[in-house]
């Protein structure tokens, strides 16, 4: 590679990392209290025998998969798995289904989630039907 190309890539990499660090610092400043509160809820639930369930659709479900069964990770993490909310049957189908009423209810009903557990809901937009419905179900059942 020509030296000019490497120099440009180096500048782009540094610029990218600087922007990421700014975003992470902003999150730390603005959300630290909330993150700490959530961590305490998860810890307290775990101490009482509770589990951390993670619900998401599309790419958002990957956080649950990532947390599940990791060496050295949190053993009580359980992803909510439902093939209808993955891309297994195609992106168009999954996108359509995540906007279908009762889809979250159907997915959550496969698990014995109690008000001693934590339900983490992951959503890119926060507006699709499935994650909103999951939050409403959690609120109704007094699940944190």
Report residues per predicted region.
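Glycine-rich phosphate-binding loops that contact phosphosugars or nucleotide phosphates
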Residues: 47-144
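Generic N-terminal amphipathic, Lys/Arg-enriched alpha-helix
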Residues: 8-30
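Short amphipathic alpha-helical segments enriched in leucine
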Residues: 21, 25-28, 43, 47, ...
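Catalytic cores of large soluble enzymes that bind and process phosphate-bearing ligands
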Residues: 12, 27-30, 34, 59, ...
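A short, well-structured juxtamembrane/interface segment
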Residues: 30-47, 107
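N-terminal amphipathic/basic-hydrophobic helices that include classical n-h-c signal peptides
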Residues: 1-8
């Amino acid at each position: 590679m020509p030296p000019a190309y490497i120099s440009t890539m180096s500048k782009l990499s540094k610029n990218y990392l600087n922007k990421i660090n700014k975003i992470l610092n902003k999150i730390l400043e603005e959300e630290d209290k909330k993150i700490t509160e959530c961590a305490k809820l998860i810890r307290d639930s775990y101490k009482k025998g509770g589990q951390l369930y993670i619900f998401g659709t599309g790419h958002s479900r990957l956080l649950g998969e990532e947390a599940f069964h990791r060496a050295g990770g949190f053993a009580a993490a359980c992803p909510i798995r439902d093939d209808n909310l993955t891309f297994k049957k195609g992106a168009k189908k999954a996108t359509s289904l995540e906007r279908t009423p009762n889809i979250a209810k159907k997915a959550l009903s496969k698990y014995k989630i109690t008000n001693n557990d934590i339900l983490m809901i992951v959503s890119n937009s926060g507006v699709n039907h499935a994650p909103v419905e999951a939050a409403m179900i959690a609120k109704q059942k007094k699940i944190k």
